[in-house]
């Protein structure tokens, strides 16, 4: 089943840089909250939130949290109803998770332009390592 959707909006929930420099080593990337999924049933919207920290020797030098909102078409939403749930397939979550992660990467690039933190590029994350199951949303009538 092909799921029709649109990337409806992006919310920068948190962004901060702290003392430190990306030129220091070792530079490490850690996902503080990883990828979290949520939904707005009435709006037929899936929300993917990416949280990440950049650390140097256990000191956070940058933190970011971005929520991406994906509006599902009414026909696709209805087509995913199964046994009292709207079941969002994990393969679709991989797709929109990847879009969300790439969006976060782009925001970091834009927010750090002209600083030494701009040399940091978030690594590729394989969505099957952070999303393990379909999303099951109880039907609300």
Language-model features, listed with the residues they occupy:
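N-terminal intrinsically disordered, cationic/polar leader segments
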Residues: 1-99, 109-141
């Amino acid at each position: 089943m092909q799921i029709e959707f649109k990337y409806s909006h992006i919310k920068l929930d948190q962004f901060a840089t702290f003392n430190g420099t990306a030129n220091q080593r070792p530079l490490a990337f850690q996902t503080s909250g990883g990828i979290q999924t949520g939904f707005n049933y009435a709006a037929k919207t899936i929300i993917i939130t990416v949280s990440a920290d950049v650390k140097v020797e256990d000191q956070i030098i940058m933190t970011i949290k971005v929520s991406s909102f994906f509006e599902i078409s009414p026909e696709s939403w209805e087509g995913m109803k199964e046994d009292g749930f709207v079941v969002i397939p994990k393969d679709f979550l991989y797709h929109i998770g990847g879009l969300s992660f790439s969006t976060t990467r782009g925001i970091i690039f834009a927010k750090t332009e002209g600083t030494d933190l701009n040399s940091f590029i978030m690594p590729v994350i394989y969505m099957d390592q952070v999303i393990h199951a379909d999303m099951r949303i109880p039907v609300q009538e």
